[in-house]
């Protein structure tokens, strides 16, 4: 099976006063290009540790991660990361925060082209009228919109999201879920998202990877989510299959998360839209 991201027998062990603690053990996952994968499990099970290793922000104890044929050994612009807190520089405007990364990635583009890229993604996330405000002048939801725009503007090969909406109220969370889906469907980036929200996982993902409880957490089960795209929240909530899958996830989290069954095979890749015009500039850097 052709994989865009391949995680093989991944281990993460931390030293403690009582001896080594293995947080993640024998974690295997294959993700195809264009898939949106949700990684779900109880708090503290190691979800964010796995994502951090994929991002190159945490060292791997054993095993390996290969992205687009290259081994992951450190952080890099081929992976755009959105954290729970957007980590914006407070003395820069939203536009300037996005431009920091754009200037590094599109270094051969003209200044005008780089500005257009930053403005394009800030407009897509709804910050056209607020892009020249500093983070202290923005709401938490607006700051997270900026974080999402910054990640997409880098034109990464893969998008990594670590509970990006966990600090938001429900209404803002739903709005930003739709913003994320619109951007993802527009750019068709491969995405791996950590969440503890069952409904969020069902709404966003093509497959949901369920992790067992830690320590020594691993893949417990994988659920395929076959709802057609683009997805409509109201239609999903009226679909009996949505509640069947929801119950399956809740049952795993409540009853089966201590077990370690073998994962299922990955779903087929999502279709890739043709690039044209402005997209060609972005895709040129994404493939380099």
Where are these regions (language model features)?
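Hydrophobic anchor residue at the start of the ABC signature
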Residues: 148
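Conserved ABC ATPase "signature" region
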Residues: 111-130, 182
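Short coil-to-helix segment of the ABC ATPase nucleotide-binding domain corresponding to the Q-loop/switch region
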Residues: 92-101
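Conserved signature/switch motifs of ABC ATPase nucleotide-binding domains
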Residues: 133-136, 154
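Conserved ABC transporter NBD signature motif
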Residues: 63-75
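The feature captures the beta-strand-to-loop junction immediately N-terminal to the Walker
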Residues: 40-42
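Helix-to-loop junction immediately C-terminal to a conserved catalytic motif
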Residues: 55
């Amino acid at each position: 099976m052709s994989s865009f991201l391949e995680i093989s027998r991944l281990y993460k062990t931390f030293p403690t006063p009582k001896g080594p603690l293995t947080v993640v053990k024998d974690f295997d996952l294959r993700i195809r290009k264009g898939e949106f994968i949700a990684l779900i499990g109880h708090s503290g099970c190691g979800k964010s540790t796995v994502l951090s290793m994929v991002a190159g922000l945490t060292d791997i104890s054993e095993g390996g991660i290969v992205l687009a044929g290259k081994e992951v050994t450190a952080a890099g612009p081929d992976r755009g990361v959105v954290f729970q807190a957007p980590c914006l520089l407070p003395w820069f405007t939203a536009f300037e925060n996005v431009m920091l990364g754009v200037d590094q990635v599109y270094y051969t583009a003209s200044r005008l082209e780089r500005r257009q890229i930053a403005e394009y993604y800030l407009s897509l996330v709804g910050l056209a009228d607020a892009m020249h405000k500093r983070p202290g002048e923005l709401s938490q939801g607006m700051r997270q919109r900026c974080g999402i725009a910054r990640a997409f503007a880098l034109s990464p090969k893969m998008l990594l999201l670590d509970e990006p909406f966990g600090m938001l109220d429900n209404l803002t969370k739903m709005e930003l879920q739709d913003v994320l889906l619109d951007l993802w469907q527009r750019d068709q980036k491969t995405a791996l998202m950590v969440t503890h929200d069952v409904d969020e996982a069902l709404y966003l993902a093509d497959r949901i990877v369920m992790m067992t409880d830690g320590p020594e957490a691993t893949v417990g089960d994988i659920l395929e989510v076959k709802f057609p795209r683009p997805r409509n929240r109201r239609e999903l909530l009226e679909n009996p299959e949505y509640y069947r899958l929801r119950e399956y996830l809740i049952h795993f989290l409540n009853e089966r998360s201590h077990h370690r069954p073998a994962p299922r095979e990955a779903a087929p890749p999502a279709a890739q839209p043709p690039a044209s015009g402005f997209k060609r500039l972005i895709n040129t850097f994404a493939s380099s």
